[in-house]
């Protein structure tokens, strides 16, 4: 799966999960940039992404994620 397809699907997930179609998903996007992205939303986001991309992340991998670009790279490495 290429980066464009990953970001397309991530954008859909972010819009749905945060109920905000104005979110622009970029590699530099972080939790600080999205209203409502707290620890609980983060867990829901990871679970939703795992289901959508049919992948499973370890706790260590999740803890290392700092921005959406890191997440997209992790997804691509599993695809």
Regions found by a protein language model. Give the residues of each.
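Phosphopantetheine-dependent thiolation modules in NRPS/PKS and related acyl-activating systems
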Residues: 2-36, 40-79
């Amino acid at each position: 799966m290429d980066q464009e397809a990953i970001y397309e699907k991530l954008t859909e997930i972010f819009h749905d999960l945060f109920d905000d179609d104005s979110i622009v998903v970029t590699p530099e996007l972080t939790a600080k940039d999205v209203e409502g992205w707290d620890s609980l939303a983060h867990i829901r986001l990871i679970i939703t992404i795992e289901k959508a991309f049919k992948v499973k992340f370890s706790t260590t991998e999740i803890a290392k994620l700092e921005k959406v670009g890191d997440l997209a790279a992790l997804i691509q490495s599993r695809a």
